[in-house]
Swiss-Prot record:
GO terms for cellular component: cytosol; glutaminase complex. The gene is pdxT. This is Pyridoxal 5'-phosphate synthase subunit PdxT. The lineage of its organism: Bacteria, Bacillati, Bacillota, Clostridia, Eubacteriales. Pathway: Cofactor biosynthesis; pyridoxal 5'-phosphate biosynthesis. Belongs to the glutaminase PdxT/SNO family. Pfam families: SNO (PF01174). Keywords: Glutamine amidotransferase, Hydrolase, Lyase, Pyridoxal phosphate. PANTHER family: PYRIDOXAL 5'-PHOSPHATE SYNTHASE SUBUNIT SNO, PYRIDOXAL 5'-PHOSPHATE SYNTHASE SUBUNIT SNO1-RELATED.
Length: 199
């Protein structure tokens, strides 16, 4: 199995380490040629979403990656990656891939709670460690979006077809369960193409 990891900015190395520990080949996606390579899954890491979005377009990566996501490529998106997937941003007119029918608020916890750690229920996995760093949260979800996790009533994890979007960083705590769940969704072989309007 080969998974592409967006590697233009942000916390991609930590994702790669977990995937490699799980026996998965990683392909760092750094340019348009990389973005057109065949991969069985995609990770959009945390970082700075505005910078990532700008680089995706400048490096000719945006359209090929969006086409793959729309066609049903499994995606795990964390923090800034969630912002890239969101159809709508509550406090920003920008849109990026816009394939995940959720409304996301950037830097939702403000400065005082900009970074924090907790352990909360995540789907069927039980309690998992969650590290939030200037994190967004999901204000609302569209039809058929499964809510996987909440913290203090705020939605911080969702699944829609082949897309998993998280407000937090599962790669920072040494817990592999969320990545394993993502890989299981790939090996399950189900593909759910999106019916999303073009950006």
């Amino acid at each position: 199995m080969r998974v592409g990891v967006l590697a233009v900015q942000g916390a991609f190395i930590e994702h790669e380490k977990i995937l490699q520990n799980l026996g998965v080949e990683c392909l760092e996606l750094r340019n348009g040629k990389d973005a057109r390579q065949d991969v069985e899954g995609l990770i959009l890491p945390g970082g700075e979403s505005t910078t990532q979005g700008k680089l995706l377009r400048e490096l000719d990566m945006f359209e090929p990656l969006r086409e793959k996501i729309v066609a049903g490529l499994p995606v795990l998106a964390t923090c800034a990656g969630l912002i890239l997937l969101a159809e709508e941003l509550a406090n920003d007119s920008a849109r990026y891939f816009a394939t995940l029918p959720v409304r996301v608020k950037r830097n939702a916890y403000g400065r005082q709670l900009g970074s924090f750690y907790t352990e909360e229920q995540f789907g069927d996995l039980g309690k998992v460690p969650m590290t939030f760093i200037r994190a967004p949260y999901i204000e609302s979800v569209g039809e058929d979006v499964e809510i996987l996790a909440k913290v203090n009533g705020d939605i911080v994890g969702v699944r829609y077809k082949n897309q998993i979007g998280l407000s937090f960083h599962p790669e920072l705590n040494g817990d592999r369960r969320i990545h394993q769940m993502f890989l299981d969704s790939i090996s399950g072989g189900k593909s759910f193409p999106c019916t999303q309007k073009a950006v």
